[in-house]
Amino acid sequence: MRRSLSVLSLAATLAALALIVASAGAAPGRGPKPCRHKCPPPPPATDCGTKTGPPSTYAHVIWIWMENHSYSQIIGSSAAPYINSLAQGCGLATNYTAVTHPSLPNYIAATSGNTWGITDDNPPSSHPLAVNSIFQQAGSAGSYEESMPSNCALSNSGTYAVRHNPETYYTNIRTACNADNVPMGTTSGGAFVTALSSGSLPKFSFVTPNLCNDMHDCSIQTGDSWLQSWVPKITASPSYQAGNTVLFITWDENDGSSGNRVPTIVVSPYTSRGTQSAAAFTHYSLLRTTEQLLGITTFLGSAATAASMRSAFGL
């Protein structure tokens, strides 16, 4: 009898403990505990493929340029869950290559259609360019540069790298650069988030993370987190929700391995979720596509013969 009572007492104790645990899990405001080791990736992005019938021209095109990673280092990587959610939930160019090495000539090629013989990363004083560029073509353009100390800064400062700010190299638009090439700010305040929330974006926006957040000096995870903090700000903006904004995310060059293949992601309300294109695209394709989206009919340099990305991504 005593043994039976002990068994009953133990069962009652275990039942009471189970009730306590269940109650704690169901308490108001108590969510699941954060994962301690490998967290599951975020669900695929849902801000693409929400509209049909793309416009003939768009009001805004935004570029975000990351740094120095190959396609295989990013796509499928557990270190980049947010980027891969965008690749799965929006559009992905699977055969997109940079133009050359190192960084600077890629930035110049993408914005003017030519490298102009540049083969280094020297500052604007070494490469003054009085040539046409997308900044001039667009009619209104803005560069949002993270960690830049002042407008249109022409030299490196801390984690700001002038070689990643192509507008500073075009001497024929220096006045515009001084006005519209600005420190980016943060997600809680500053030039870019204000332009997004107020609907005052220029037609063309060039967005440059600092040397840590662009993956140049810091980890893939750091860049992935940075994009996760900023891209939802873009897709929640009035201009994106209205269906007149397209975002391109690309990398300037790969890690130096052969082929120079880099990830490029297309985010737009008209791009069906999970769209992939294996067409051969380059930074010149990005320039041509941007010109088309903004209604520009004269293509700069090699953009004139580059493949357009427009139809591949439903733009």
Regions found by a protein language model. Give the residues of each.
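Hydrophobic alpha-helical segments, principally membrane-spanning helices and signal/leader peptides
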Residues: 1, 7-8, 52, 237
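Secretory targeting and sorting signals
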Residues: 2-27
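N-terminal pro-sequences and low-complexity stem/linker regions of secreted or lumenal proteins
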Residues: 26-315
